[in-house]
Amino acid sequence: MDSQNILARENELKPQQDSASNISIITKALQELGYSWSDVCLDNVDYRQFKYEDRVRWTTYIQPALAYPMIHRALSQISRNKTAATDYVESKGYVTPKSVTVTTGNCQHSELENLLEKSQALVVKPVYGSLSRGVTRNISDAQILHNTVKAALLNDDCVIVQQQFYGDEVRLVVVDGVLAAAVLRQRPQVIGDGEKQLRQLIEQENAQRGLISDTMVSYPMLNEINCDMPNLNLDSVPYAGETVVLGYGSMIANGASVYDVMDVLAAGYKHMSEDIASSMGAKFLVVDVITRDPHNFTDYCFLEFNTSPVLKLFYSCRDGQHADVAPILANAIHKITK
């Protein structure tokens, strides 16, 4: 092997490497198990190799996603394909959104219009995509729907149109057949007290956000950008106990709040995620669902799979009660690479 094509730097973080990146978080967890590591560059792609007792046990991409050794090829393919993932979960008897897959040259006009008639709103997104890339929500007009699909097909050969389900996202992490973590990604919201105007409640929420510390992701202030729910009346006075959802964001950067809900999650979510992972032979799988109430397994909908989640999310619970998944993943890596 040509040594000029390999650049190795053992156990030394590159200056530009984010300490909250996936590779940094998993590296720290593996080091605590006694692993050493080195970076190599092969054909202009950066990799990291992990050694245990002088034997290379795992090699992974450094960016953007990690190639976990627990992920087999079929699982990776199904997870990346939102249509395949939805079909698989539906075949297991769990709730999925009604959907239509559209490809270049086959726009399925009648099926799309039929789906729109049966839905409050639709969402358009690429079949292959992550981090909300290319996602358009709240489509309720036929012409807007066709224009959105047409525009989406300029960037992707295949898009999926689904019924939009309103609720908050829950990320379920299954490792070695057992639900290991569950975090709620709660949309930006405030709770009324029967006295304050909505604008005052938002100001109060922002004051609380300013006190949040010990999170890998910083919480932004709520503003007109992340409070994008239509028809918000800032002068209104929500009644005591009323939850006012302010926006659609499911990421912290878009106003969402993250909480560890492992101890309060309804048992049905645990059974569902473990059942799906087991049936796929998955040693590691992330199942994302949308729910109106994580305490009840009655009003939910499957969203998508993930095989390389953003780890810093689990260490950004706003109350400081984080979901410590890195050691769990490190132990799974250690076990499967023996």
Task: Please give the residue ranges for each predicted region.
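ATP-binding N-terminal substructure of ATP-dependent carboxylate-amine bond-forming enzymes
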Residues: 1-80, 84-87, 104-110
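Alpha-helix-centered segments that form part of catalytic cores
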Residues: 77, 231-260
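Anionic group-transfer/hydrolysis microenvironments
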Residues: 127, 164-165, 290, 306-308
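Oxyanion-binding "anion nests"
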Residues: 201-244
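A short glycine-rich, hydrophobically flanked beta-strand micro-motif that places a catalytic Asp/Glu
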Residues: 41, 159-163, 170, 282-295
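C-terminal active-site "lid" helix and adjoining low-complexity regulatory extension at the edge
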Residues: 17, 251-271, 278-284, 291-338
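Active-site nucleotide/adenylate-binding loops and adjacent lid/helix of ATP-dependent enzymes
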Residues: 63-66, 72-218, 266-271
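A short beta-strand motif that forms the metal-chelation/ATP-contact edge
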Residues: 48-59, 171-181, 295-313
